[in-house]
Amino acid sequence: MFQFHLEVLLPYLLPLLLLILPTTIFFLTKPNNKVSSTSTNNNIITLPKSYPLIGSYLSFRKNLHRRIQWLSDIVQISPSATFQLDGTLGKRQIITGNPSTVQHILKNQFSNYQKGTTFTNTLSDFLGTGIFNTNGPNWKFQRQVASHEFNTKSIRNFVEHIVDTELTNRLIPILTSSTQTNNILDFQDILQRFTFDNICNIAFGYDPEYLTPSTNRSKFAEAYEDATEISSKRFRLPLPIIWKIKKYFNIGSEKRLKEAVTEVRSFAKKLVREKKRELEEKSSLETEDMLSRFLSSGHSDEDFVADIVISFILAGKDTTSAALTWFFWLLWKNPRVEEEIVNELSKKSELMVYDEVKEMVYTHAALSESMRLYPPVPMDSKEAVNDDVLPDGWVVKKGTIVTYHVYAMGRMKSLWGDDWAEFRPERWLEKDEVNGKWVFVGRDSYSYPVFQAGPRVCLGKEMAFMQMKRIVAGIVGKFKVVPEAHLAQEPGFISFLSSQMEGGFPVTIQKRDS
């Protein structure tokens, strides 16, 4: 009974206790509202009110259900696309959508903006010291070893063999069967299964066979989702001490997290042990995957390599499936774009090879446009190692969290024009004056930081695009993905460590007329 009451009361009890601290502490923080109110879409948007000690926690909690959109609204009305969000006990977070500031923290002052202790401590139970939760020599080592997986030869093998096999032998039969039964599929779940099989194949040389006609969910998949969600929700608490107390007493969400992480790490360690055994039994492997490279590099500690495995599952499974989920919803909402893609595919062979996939220029633009509006990672944060001043004049104190808001940047008129809300792949294209074909014209990575930028830019960007284009070709060339009627209204866009469509993506599959 004590544990139950503690679980329920903690998020409310601690902020209340803060309010009755001595008057001397009362003035440690003061309201800091630098942006005046304005009107956007007939809704009055203002910088959240800040109170002593609890900062803007009340506004944050009120908007927790739509925190990404709420923070995006504020970024867009802020004069320099940057504002300060006051946390509890004087903590400050600067949130920006300013490309100059993004370049400043991701490139120009890279060494001063790291994965700080706020980030690493919060995610250490789940991600350990994997590449997304570390800095310095450890990060450099993991990045260097992983980079060998993303050369042209590896990407070609990935597209022509791994992705194509998963399409031909698993996804296409499931979709074909669905056209006959007219049953409803959760397409978000289907895509997550597909990309999970793919990342395990290319990175670990292991096929989990998760994409099957059965809708039963594996114990690992459920544990992985729980670990991702609960770890992410730690960031939303007013004080870290709340989740730390729950962890100490092993209650509530922290008890579930411990159970989930145990299951996830058990899976990862099993992969590591099997790969070690394979390396011991064979003098050489037919194909050298990323896991083999890490184990052959002299770093054979099981816990450390398990951290790497978990991080790369996060990178390869969740982000790609998130991008494709929103892409197929947008395609249904914009039949003109779908017809353009069908037309592009009509000029390709059915069993597309690497070069044909690479030349899917319009589809590449459509995917880029989709991720502009619905980025797989809508926000990312760094922590200042030392005091600094941002290009737009904001003063950053040591230990301050600086967050760049990718979702907001994709909706800024200053970057995309008055038609920013329109799904228009042509904004990424130009006509070649000689042959009249489309040519893709990219944006600089600081205005479009969907794949991060600077030294931490995503290693798998090219592989991700190639995988997505091959999947789009395999599906759109044969089928129509038709969402349920209620999805005519924009579904909920939520995010844990990567974005999702709230409530799944229920669809029916129809055969495309030839």
UniProtKB/Swiss-Prot annotation:
Q: Could you tell me one molecular function GO term of this UniProt entry?
A: oxidoreductase activity, acting on paired donors, with incorporation or reduction of molecular oxygen
- The answer, when asked if Endoplasmic reticulum is one of the entry's keywords, is yes
Q: Report TM segments.
A: 7-29
Record has Lyase as a keyword: no
Q: What is its EC number?
A: 1.14.-.-
Q: Which Pfam families match?
A: p450
Q: Where is the signal peptide?
A: none
Q: Which cofactor does it need?
A: heme
The UniProt record describes its induction as: By clofibrate.
For this record, the Gene Ontology CC terms, alphabetical, are: endoplasmic reticulum membrane
Positions bound to heme: 458
Q: What class of enzyme is it?
A: oxidoreductase
The entry's localization annotation reads:
Endoplasmic reticulum membrane
Supply the alphabetized keyword list: Endoplasmic reticulum, Heme, Iron, Membrane, Metal-binding, Monooxygenase, Oxidoreductase, Transmembrane, Transmembrane helix
Q: How does it sit in the membrane?
A: Single-pass membrane protein
Family according to the record: Belongs to the cytochrome P450 family.
Q: What does this protein do?
A: Catalyzes the omega-hydroxylation of various fatty acids (FA) from 10 to 18 carbon atoms. The substrate specificity is higher for laurate > palmitate > myristate > linolenate > linoleate > oleate > caprate. May play a minor role in cutin synthesis and could be involved in plant defense.
For this entry, the protein name equals: Cytochrome P450 94A1
The gene it comes from is CYP94A1
